[in-house]
Amino acid sequence: MLDSKLLRAELDETAAKLARRGFPLDVETIRELEEKRKSLQMKTEELQALRNSRSKSIGQAKAKGDHEEAERILAEVGNLGAELDQAKVTLAELQSELETITMSIPNLPDAEVPDGKDEDDNVEVSRWGQPKTYDFEVKDHVDLGEMSGGLDFASAVKISGSRFIVMKGKFARLHRAIAQFMLDLHTDEHGYTEMYVPYLVNHDSLYGTGQLPKFGEDLFHTSPLTEQVSDVPLKTLSLIPTAEVPVTNMVRDTITDEAELPLKMTAHTPCFRSEAGSYGRDTRGLIRMHQFDKVELVQITKPEDSMAALEELTGHAEKVLQLLELPYRKVILCTGDMGFGSAKTYDLEVWVPAQETYREISSCSNMWDFQARRMQARFRRKGEKKPELVHTLNGSGLAVGRTMVAILENNQEADGRIAIPTVLQPYMGGVTHIG
């Protein structure tokens, strides 16, 4: 969440920055509530001071033997206490109302982020590789997988429903090989520590990384929700939409020594998403699933290091695509297409031949201190007493299913067989083709 000081001292400037990403900040309501809060805060402090002062007078009156005066002051103190209690209740209600508003406010965009309304306004930064040309009719990954029986959508529908997949044989092994290759690359060459984390997380974890309270409907929960979808019961466990949630929450409510930063962590997990807002989109194939695997990259840094860390983390995701020899492009998301908690995001989009377009395969984001403030994730500089908020970053390195789509379609041959990328062959027992 944003620093509350911005909503007090720099309200108009903050509203202008949020307007860049199409978020209409209700300045007048916030200003009115803040004025009431300040007035009530002063009243509460004055009542507290007066009650303390009058309480001392009770003892003084008793010392003088004036019990009648002592009783009168005692009654006065009782009335002051009741008035103070009511003022505290009202103040807490005002603070809660302000906090509710604050929770709904997205992060401020970095100055380098281009203005725009949606994905059409994202700006291409670079391209790598050249899409192949084929002298035969290109098949999509669904046809390629079903030809050999390696992808079984029908069984998945029977078992679970739409947007699920059953993989068999060499296709299942390829899926596993992709994830293992990514983990080995990130741990052995990029310096990340591999993590094994829970796939079910609590309310505080989802709040910390920003999925709650705003995006409760996008999650799968282990117990029924209340009538309002965003009001997830505090004891509910939810399936992770991304390993970003459990991995980033490793630093929740902790103070890290400066010397330990940056923290670089990676995890391979399944991810679960309801795709509530995606009805009718990408209904064919592996592009948009309720359950999919992903290798996640997370970095925890000092504030002054986070922008350089974003470039590094994005480069680590790019390296996967380069070693797999998959053509891709890198784009910077515009203000209207950024995620709720992001200050700056790069998307990597891989070439998908059957669609003749680039599709997102990784999003790499710098959250600044937006998540850290929610999580109270801090660090302490050497020689300093007061801790500071860390900056958090995350990115896909990569989405395993979409990587498999790209390999199947880009590496297809005329007979429907798939050439296995050289770097994956050791993970496939030396197999060079499947299908």
From Swiss-Prot:
Annotated Gene Ontology cellular component terms: cytoplasm
Catalytic activity of the protein: tRNA(Ser) + L-serine + ATP = L-seryl-tRNA(Ser) + AMP + diphosphate + H(+); tRNA(Sec) + L-serine + ATP = L-seryl-tRNA(Sec) + AMP + diphosphate + H(+)
Presence of the UniProt keyword Flavoprotein in the record: no
EC class (word): ligase
SUPFAM superfamilies: Class II aaRS and biotin synthetases, tRNA-binding arm
EC annotation from Swiss-Prot or TrEMBL: 6.1.1.11
GO biological process per UniProt: selenocysteine biosynthetic process; seryl-tRNA aminoacylation
Keyword Repeat: no
Primary residence: cytoplasm
Pathway in which this enzyme or protein is active: Aminoacyl-tRNA biosynthesis; selenocysteinyl-tRNA(Sec) biosynthesis; L-seryl-tRNA(Sec) from L-serine and tRNA(Sec): step 1/1
Keywords: Aminoacyl-tRNA synthetase, ATP-binding, Cytoplasm, Ligase, Nucleotide-binding, Protein biosynthesis
InterPro entries xrefs: aa-tRNA-synt_IIb, aa-tRNA-synth_II, aa-tRNA-synth_II/BPL/LPL, Ser-tRNA-ligase_type_1, Ser-tRNA-synth_1_N, SerRS_1_N_sf, SerRS_core, tRNA-bd_arm
GO molecular function annotations of the record: ATP binding; serine-tRNA ligase activity
Amino acids binding L-serine: T242, A243, E244, E296, S396
Residues holding ATP: R273, S274, E275, E360, I361, S362, S363
Entry's localization field: Cytoplasm
Domain characteristics, as noted in the entry: Consists of two distinct domains, a catalytic core and a N-terminal extension that is involved in tRNA binding.
NCBIfam families, sorted: serS
Subunit structure of this chain's protein: Homodimer. The tRNA molecule binds across the dimer.
Functional description taken from the UniProt entry: Catalyzes the attachment of serine to tRNA(Ser). Is also able to aminoacylate tRNA(Sec) with serine, to form the misacylated tRNA L-seryl-tRNA(Sec), which will be further converted into selenocysteinyl-tRNA(Sec).
Family stated for the protein in its record: Belongs to the class-II aminoacyl-tRNA synthetase family. Type-1 seryl-tRNA synthetase subfamily.
Protein name: Serine--tRNA ligase
Organism this protein belongs to: Vibrio atlanticus (strain LGP32)
Gene name of the encoded protein: serS
